[in-house]
């Protein structure tokens, strides 16, 4: 089990994640992919990473816009797992030409 991050830790770590914001007990980011197939590839890449970590995001797909929301529900808030998965999502998005803030 991961421990909950403090507010200060969350703020500091979000500074390294372009486009990610905190909303209550979640961190969220929206990415705009070049086209719909690229958006689906991004979701597929994130699914592989999420399975590897056994930590799964909430995902909303709208045409070429994909929104990810992360929280460690078993802990009731944000943990290092959320930050690590956010970094993996950001890396996958970058490799597929998706930009944060879509």
Where are these regions (language model features)?
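Charge-rich alpha-helical segments
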Residues: 1-102
